[in-house]
Amino acid sequence: MENHSKNGNIIAIITMMFLYAMISFVTNLAAPIGVIWKNVFADSGSANMIGMLGNAMNFLAYLFMGIPAGKLLTKIGYKKTALTGIATGFVGVLIQFLSGKFGADISGFAVYLFGAFISGFAVCILNTVVNPMLNLIGGGGNRGNQLNLIGGTLNSLSGTLTPMLVGALIGTVTANTKMVDVNLVLYIALAVFAAAFVILNFIPIQDPEMGKTTDKTVFEHSPWAFRHFNLGVIAIFVYVGVEVGIPGTLNFYISDTTANGGGFINGTPLANAAAIGGFVAGTYWLLMLVGRLCSSFIADKVSSRMMMMIANGAGMIFIVLAVLLGKSTTVEMPVFTGTSFQMVTVPIAAMFLVLCGLCTSIMWSSIFNLATEGLGKYTAQASGIFMMMVVGGGLMPLVQNFIADNAGYMASYIVPLICMAYMFFYAVAGCKNINKDIPVD
């Protein structure tokens, strides 16, 4: 009986790991698929903004589902909440798949956006449940934390591979490129969601006791009574926009073989530009993975505040260099062109923007730690509000690509530059708790 329970836990852990990866997979699917829709509406004058709409719909779901997801977890428990998220994810990806059947027109695009929105609900629900569920299966403590670190690594790895895989399937964007060209990744997503639902359905998972102290706790105030939390909410909103906007717009930039794009170098368009763009964007996520691994070794020696100052300072320098140098100089990067690995010439701006992945890798946890420090019993409410603010990952890239359409790709990076400047301010002064007189016990 004990062996049966142990084997069940191993299967549950593996399933949760796959879901951890799927969260990043579904989230990072929107930007590379946006290359297809951007091309479909290339003559609209707002192609980049249109291409980023799928990403916007994905993150917009957090605004509506952030707090309800937490309430759902409390009401029906970890397992049923996870199953709800998995089923919702399956439906969302299925709708995106069906959008290809409607054709490359406004009707197909509308169906795709609806699918991206539903997928956003799924990702939000899974984000709410996967972390604590892995901790629960691991028995808490160091073992539970270890499982979450492994899951986070798979999450980053999935974020790295997704734009690369989609880019390789698309190759070079042409007038004939359609949603059906990325059916393989959608099939993979559907299969993983279906398998996870079946496996998890048959695994007994005991929910922890929830809600006993909450009902007895008196809340005289709210997280909004704390200035450093209010400023932290803005910081998390703009951070997610920076994290998504930098590689998403970079993918569009490299995939664009017109004179304005990074895929047009020295008078020659790049062959397989979409594949190269996806790989370059994937390298950004790879550096985020590297940054998270490295920072885990120094987190006990360097404060969140100091890491934020260093990361945002370096990030601003990288963005300024990218904007100033643009395509004036080129560098060679190892990329997969869709057929083989090669050294490919890309604008030097791409290299500096990719390096920003090292900077953004530590920001979520650092902002969360700084913004919730000293909140005590208000921390749970603060977490729900933070989950809603992930919507910044949809809205800020939309603003950035509106600027890209009207003023150029490099000019659009003024958006993440301003956002990083704000986060630098938050680390220097905004994170200080000046409301210590408010009781939090």
Task: Give residue ranges: language-model regions.
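Conserved MFS/SLC helix-loop-helix module at the cytosolic interface between two early adjacent transmembrane helices
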Residues: 64-109
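C-terminal ends and interior cores of transmembrane alpha-helices
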Residues: 87-105, 313-342
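Extracytoplasmic gate region of multi-pass secondary transporters
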Residues: 30-31, 162, 224-282
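Helix-loop-helix hairpin linking two adjacent transmembrane segments in secondary transporters
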Residues: 144-204
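Central cavity-lining transmembrane alpha-helices of secondary-active solute carriers
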Residues: 52-71, 282-294, 392-395
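Extracytoplasmic
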Residues: 11-43, 130-131, 246-254
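Intracellular juxtamembrane helix-capping segments at the cytosolic ends
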Residues: 125-139, 360-376
